[in-house]
Regions:
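Extracellular/periplasmic catalytic domains that process cell-envelope and extracellular macromolecules
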Residues: 1, 44-48, 55-56, 70-72, ...
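Core segments of cupin and vicinal oxygen chelate
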Residues: 9-58
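Vicinal oxygen chelate
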Residues: 11, 25, 56-60, 71-72, ...
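Aromatic/hydrophobic pocket-lining residues that form the small-molecule binding cavity
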Residues: 15, 88, 135
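Extracytoplasmic/secreted envelope proteins and their assembly/folding machinery
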Residues: 19, 89-92, 139
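A charge-rich, low-complexity, intrinsically flexible signal that marks solvent-exposed coils, linkers
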Residues: 41-43, 74-76, 159
Length: 159
């Protein structure tokens, strides 16, 4: 690890599986190194995968197989901006279809418990519109969604 700042994500023995899935699912993502434990440790044995260096959409990450003590929470999430409904659907379906869990307003958790937000750019533009009534309509439409539907957001924006 030579980067000055890297996100460290804690896993219970599944860091390589998660990193590989992210690399296969998101553009500009790759698994760059796998480090095996030089000796036994509380949640593993010598030779087990201890850490995995990977990049998710250009963001450097380190997956640490630290054991079952700590879990991911919604306090941390990756937000992915999408350009169209097809991209939104592809990413949403990839994560949810691989054991993920849907939540509200474009949020979901992957099968490892990590939270993600799939946020179409049109939504960000809509809720920050200088027309505050239109922004409110778009916001209220989003509040009733799980996966964001761009056509519904655009219709709400127009009134």
């Amino acid at each position: 690890m030579t980067r000055k700042n890297t996100i460290c994500l804690w896993y219970d023995g599944t860091a390589l599986e998660a990193a590989t899935f992210y690399a296969e699912t998101f553009p500009d993502s790759v698994v760059s190194a796998v480090h095996r434990a030089p000796g036994d440790y509380p949640s593993g044995k010598q030779g087990d995968v201890l850490t995995v260096e990977f990049t998710v959409m250009g963001i450097p990450c380190l997956g640490l197989n630290g054991g079952p003590v700590f879990k991911h929470s919604e306090a941390f999430s990756f937000q992915v901006a999408t350009d169209n409904q097809a991209e939104t659907d592809r990413l949403w379906n990839a994560i949810v279809g691989n054991g993920g869990e849907e939540s509200a307003c474009g949020w979901y958790k992957d099968k490892w418990g990590l939270s993600w937000q799939i946020t179409p750019r049109v939504l960000t533009t809509a809720i920050s519109s200088p027309d505050r009534a239109a922004a409110k309509r778009a916001f209220e439409a989003m509040m009733g969604m799980r996966k964001i539907d761009i056509a519904t957001i655009e219709a709400a924006l127009k009134g």
